[in-house]
Amino acid sequence: MATKKEEVKFEDNLAELENIVRKLESGDVALEDAIAEFQKGMKISETLKKTLNEAEQTLVKIVGKDDNESEFSAEQKEY
């Protein structure tokens, strides 16, 4: 059985991180709350990064099956 943490969708985590960023950018947060929100945001960010890395590896495996395609890396593409 999946834990509650595992059931949170990527999009939900991204939306939560965006809300945290908005709160912190507003400047209307007490220092202690800002630190707590920042820590929460960092944890969410790591989860998102892990999910994206796993998705990238899956795509690399899929694309790698076709001899006409080559492996790619997120570091190679600047956004």
UniProtKB/Swiss-Prot annotation:
<dbReference type="GO" id="GO:0005829">
    <property type="term" value="C:cytosol"/>
</dbReference>
<keyword id="KW-0269">Exonuclease</keyword>
<protein>
    <recommendedName>
        <fullName>Exodeoxyribonuclease 7 small subunit</fullName>
        <ecNumber>3.1.11.6</ecNumber>
    </recommendedName>
</protein>
<comment type="subunit">
    <text>Heterooligomer composed of large and small subunits.</text>
</comment>
<keyword id="KW-0540">Nuclease</keyword>
<keyword id="KW-0963">Cytoplasm</keyword>
<keyword id="KW-0378">Hydrolase</keyword>
<comment type="similarity">
    <text>Belongs to the XseB family.</text>
</comment>
<dbReference type="GO" id="GO:0006308">
    <property type="term" value="P:DNA catabolic process"/>
</dbReference>
<dbReference type="GO" id="GO:0008855">
    <property type="term" value="F:exodeoxyribonuclease VII activity"/>
</dbReference>
<dbReference type="InterPro" id="IPR003761">
    <property type="entry name" value="Exonuc_VII_S"/>
</dbReference>
<dbReference type="GO" id="GO:0009318">
    <property type="term" value="C:exodeoxyribonuclease VII complex"/>
</dbReference>
<dbReference type="Pfam" id="PF02609">
    <property type="entry name" value="Exonuc_VII_S"/>
</dbReference>
<dbReference type="InterPro" id="IPR037004">
    <property type="entry name" value="Exonuc_VII_ssu_sf"/>
</dbReference>
<comment type="function">
    <text>Bidirectionally degrades single-stranded DNA into large acid-insoluble oligonucleotides, which are then degraded further into small acid-soluble oligonucleotides.</text>
</comment>
